[in-house]
């Protein structure tokens, strides 16, 4: 989902549950036989975040496989979906909204479906456990430090959200306190008390969001402890993660997903590769180890800065990044008579658009590797590409978000 890096567009529930199917497609859970599972969350009815609550994991995979097979039947063979050995506690980015009830109880958790009412959640079955414990302890610390939660209606109060990000390979932890003001009373003592409870915390950042907005993060970050970022390793490379950086929430499946994407590119060390919607450069940097040259293109300026930093951090010298619209960039390449052997595209859930897809056709790479997080928009985009000279060779679904309807897919297209 490299096109979604940067700030949040709206206040999400903990697993981005409000994803709606396009074109009237039936919801996946309606296709499931709903075989019962012992993994039933006590907050399920209030939160509504997990579409497959109480459904055995094997049944979830079976349902998703059948759905993708039917959806992509006009285009190609669909390989067996790649699931997880342990589908619990996989989210390494945890967001909690904070509020105070009419009775004065401080609550922290997810928004109730289709509302801004906060469901108080102490432990979520799909979230990294230490992150949940940190959020719980922050909630318990607020009264002793006289920190009030922010009220959306009145604009009164201080703490709006807490974001915890943890590196899967490194174990580094970043805590982001989203406040309505840059002033946190007794900030040094607060950080000291929090680190005493959780000494594994690597950095604490104060993010200032002083606007009446549905965005979670503001534009200004103040580092209270540590470097203001953490690092994690993926496919042998090290990546910097700052408060607003896009970085996949399920590192176990992401590594498998990216390895498949690089494999499908069939790189021999000579190819010129375009990493479109490159985000913070993860796929492109990994691909650069086996390519002749990689060009990363991304519209988000902050993401490009992170991408350049990540390339330097990994001593990757055969990659260049451009802060530009990927479609426009490739059209200009084609007009100049330039070529690319492979295009790797990782668009947001809304998919690509005709302007970008037409630029792919004009540039005419031998192979296109499409990394999708939206099945219906994937099918739509494949329809366009197959009408313009490309053949879909195969598709491999990945279950990066167990207990939800979301499906990621790697697709190979060739001329």
Locate predicted features.
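Nucleotide donor/acceptor-binding cores
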Residues: 92, 171-173, 270-271
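Rossmann-like S-adenosyl-L-methionine
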Residues: 2-31, 186-188, 192-415
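Short, aliphatic-rich beta-strand segments
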Residues: 99, 164, 171-180, 238-242, ...
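Short helix/loop segment immediately N-terminal to the Walker
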Residues: 149-156, 273
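Short, solvent-exposed loop/turn elements at beta->coil junctions and helix N-caps
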Residues: 80-87, 152-153, 161, 165, ...
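Accessory substrate-recognition/RNA-binding modules or partner subunits associated with SAM-dependent
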Residues: 120-122, 126, 131, 135, ...
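Short, acidic/hydrophobic/Gly-rich beta-strand patch recurrent on exposed beta strands
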Residues: 109-112, 176-178, 307
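Extended interfacial segments that mediate partner engagement and assembly in macromolecular machines
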Residues: 35-39, 48-149, 169, 184
């Amino acid at each position: 989902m490299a096109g979604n890096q940067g700030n949040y567009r709206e206040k999400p529930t903990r697993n981005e549950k409000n994803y709606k199917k396009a074109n009237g497609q039936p919801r996946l859970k309606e296709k499931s036989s709903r075989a019962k599972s012992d993994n039933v969350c006590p907050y399920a009815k209030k939160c509504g975040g997990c579409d497959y609550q109480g459904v055995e994991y094997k049944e979830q995979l079976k349902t998703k496989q059948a759905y993708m097979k039917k959806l992509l039947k006009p285009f190609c063979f669909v390989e067996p979906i790649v699931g997880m050995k342990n589908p619990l506690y996989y989210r390494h980015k945890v967001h909690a909204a904070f509020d105070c009830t009419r009775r004065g109880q401080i609550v922290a958790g997810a928004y109730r479906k289709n509302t801004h009412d906060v469901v108080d959640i102490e432990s979520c079955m799909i979230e990294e456990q230490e992150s949940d414990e940190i959020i719980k302890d922050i909630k318990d610390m607020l009264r002793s430090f006289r920190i009030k939660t922010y009220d959306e209606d009145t604009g009164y109060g201080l703490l709006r959200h807490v974001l915890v990000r943890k590196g899967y390979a490194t174990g580094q932890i970043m805590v982001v306190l989203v406040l309505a003001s840059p002033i946190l009373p007794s900030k040094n003592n607060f950080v000291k008390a929090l680190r005493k409870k959780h000494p594994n915390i690597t950095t604490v950042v104060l993010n200032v969001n002083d606007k009446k907005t549905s965005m979670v993060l503001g534009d200004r970050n103040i580092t209270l402890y540590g470097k203001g970022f953490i690092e994690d390793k993926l496919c042998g490379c090290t990546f910097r993660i700052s408060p607003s950086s896009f970085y996949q929430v399920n590192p176990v499946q992401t590594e498998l997903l990216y390895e498949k994407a690089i494999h499908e590119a069939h790189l021999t060390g000579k190819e010129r590769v375009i990493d479109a919607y490159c985000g913070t450069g993860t796929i492109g940097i990994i691909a650069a180890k086996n390519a002749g040259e990689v060009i990363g293109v991304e519209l988000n300026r902050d993401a490009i800065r992170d991408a350049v930093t990540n390339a330097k951090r990994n001593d990757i010298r055969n990659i260049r990044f451009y802060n530009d619209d990927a479609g426009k960039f490739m059209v200009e390449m084609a007009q100049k008579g330039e070529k690319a052997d492979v295009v790797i595209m990782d668009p947001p859930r809304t998919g690509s658009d005709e302007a970008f897809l037409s630029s792919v056709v004009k540039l005419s790479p031998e192979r296109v590797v499409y990394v999708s997080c939206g099945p219906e928009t994937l099918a739509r985009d494949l329809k366009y590409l197959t009408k313009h000279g490309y053949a879909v060779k195969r598709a491999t679904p990945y279950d990066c978000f167990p207990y939800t309807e979301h499906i990621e897919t790697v697709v190979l297209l060739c001329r």
